[in-house]
From Swiss-Prot:
Family statement drawn from the similarity comment of this UniProt entry: Belongs to the PPR family. P subfamily.
Each PPR repeat, start to end: 151-181, 184-218, 221-257, 258-292, 293-327, 328-358, 369-404, 405-439, 440-474, 475-509, 510-544, 545-579, 580-614, 615-650, 651-685, 686-720
Membrane-spanning residues: none
Keywords, in A-Z order: Repeat
One Pfam family hit: PPR_1
Entry keyword annotation includes Electron transport: no
Organism annotation: Arabidopsis thaliana (Mouse-ear cress)
Name of the featured protein: Pentatricopeptide repeat-containing protein At5g28460
Coiled coil: none
Amino acid sequence: MSIMLSISRRQNSYILLNHSRFLRRFSYDVDPRPEIKSESQEFVVVKFVKTLQNTPQHDWASSESLSALVVSSSSASPLVFSQITRRLGSYSLAISFFEYLDAKSQSLKRREESLSLALQSVIEFAGSEPDPRDKLLRLYEIAKEKNIPLTIVATKLLIRWFGRMGMVNQSVLVYERLDSNMKNSQVRNVVVDVLLRNGLVDDAFKVLDEMLQKESVFPPNRITADIVLHEVWKERLLTEEKIIALISRFSSHGVSPNSVWLTRFISSLCKNARANTAWDILSDLMKNKTPLEAPPFNALLSCLGRNMDISRMNDLVLKMDEVKIRPDVVTLGILINTLCKSRRVDEALEVFEQMRGKRTDDGNVIKADSIHFNTLIDGLCKVGRLKEAEELLVRMKLEERCVPNAVTYNCLIDGYCRAGKLETAKEVVSRMKEDEIKPNVVTVNTIVGGMCRHHGLNMAVVFFMDMEKEGVKGNVVTYMTLIHACCSVSNVEKAMYWYEKMLEAGCSPDAKIYYALISGLCQVRRDHDAIRVVEKLKEGGFSLDLLAYNMLIGLFCDKNNAEKVYEMLTDMEKEGKKPDSITYNTLISFFGKHKDFESVERMMEQMREDGLDPTVTTYGAVIDAYCSVGELDEALKLFKDMGLHSKVNPNTVIYNILINAFSKLGNFGQALSLKEEMKMKMVRPNVETYNALFKCLNEKTQGETLLKLMDEMVEQSCEPNQITMEILMERLSGSDELVKLRKFMQGYSVASPTEKASPFDVFSLG
């Protein structure tokens, strides 16, 4: 199949020379750089070169000694003339010798071979010249004119060099003029490479398709795959799907991509969430028994490990074993790391023992290193098996080339901190120093974090300051941990102190630190300081997240600062942050407290337009607002709307709001009716429910109802609180009532006349 026409349409960089085709083959297959082992041949080469160097070039043709050497040398291997040409050291001498040899070629016993090999050496010199174009064209013309067959090496050199000079047509001409039986895989590989590098993808694939045919005389080899796959992926010449199909076609010839390329491709597929496709590629290559190594499998194992797909990891390792692909030290690391992360430490230890000491495909032995030991020690610490972790550390110290490092000790420190053994963690730091391993910032952060989690903020501060004296400086994580800890105990002053210290230390705060400070300041209602931190956050190039906006809006609503509330909402809109249910609920509550029901309705409508359904908190805020201004009819209307038109059902809080409102108005019947409705709808009343009802009752006229409600609390295990006791003490002032109150406090029924007295009553009543 000719590819000349398709190329000539697109490239006119070189006008093809119009020569008639050779009547004979135009190539000669010879090893490119043969070694001359015979001493007599080496003697001939040395003697010939010395004679040439000692004879003026214009006297070569008439030199009888040189003529005699040509005759005597021709009885040796034709390789002699290749070596002689090569040793002349320059293109000018090499071409002159070739022309001399051609003139004397009638004296050569194996003329074609001798001239072919000598010409190959001249071509090698020409290609290394500063401007080789004309020289290479001349040599190619000489070969055609004199019917000197090119060696395979010379052919490949011409195709490659013409291609590099942008003379792709000339490269193809050299290839096309070869006899078909001389277009072997080596030559085709060079042609495909030249065409791909020059962007002639279709033409390259015409040559490649011939190689990939099932009965191809010259099938692809590993070099073919390397050339094609590297170029098409690097230049994005084919889609992933077409590359996968191409790999399959190579696989059918028993050819696999080189391990480095295949590993990168598998990794790319995994990164694009195509682990199943990566699996299929490796399965196809294994099915066709192509030579494979561990790295591509490691790439897929890493992906499966990140997804914690241990079952498929196990299947893949079994497949590797079936086709005799030996795992390597990286495989070991991936397996034990995944097993440890999934808390399957015993299996990780088992794999560790089974694989270490085994030989890899390159003949090396899998040896445990510090990373493996650190992974296992960390895994043991994460599941609280600290004693075994310590034992593994002792074993690690005895292992060759496995010296514990800061990571090792930091894993142990983290384990002890997780277990709350802070003093032991500090002892490990001392052991680090004894082993001449310097604690680092991770060490500091681990212990500071552990102390802060276990309510040891002061301990954390002392430890951090001691480490600073030893030259170990904190980083953003250190300060963020301390700031979070201070905010969690509402010690905002100290949080701001550590914020200032962080700036002094040259650490740039990240958004999380600003969010922590804003949260802490909002909790203690320090709006001016919160605004200052927001300004610092924006100066640092950060923006508020939705949670921070909601906290600030809540703070300004509590402070009745409507101006700042609107400012925050405007800022949110500029930043492209859409309000969520929390934002709307906060605003609805704010407007409700200010009796601005028009804005409340507008907010609820806007909420629905934004695709947000009002939540139970939304309804609670509005109902509470109506109740607070005595608009109980509107509150009940909205309450009933919840059951009819909304997916949100009233909860205990909403019922309590209404019960409390009716109780304040002395409407016990309506309040009690709502409590009974709670029972029917399986909404559990709490102590606030009963407190509201108790407040509405008068012991003299409604004493029996009061006692029944007390019994109901006992039945539902609803614990009374201080407010309950204060209300009941006012309602039950007589001696009999006080006995009942005491029984109620002890968890006994008080209304039933058949209720047995507690055996302890005799003592408690005196």
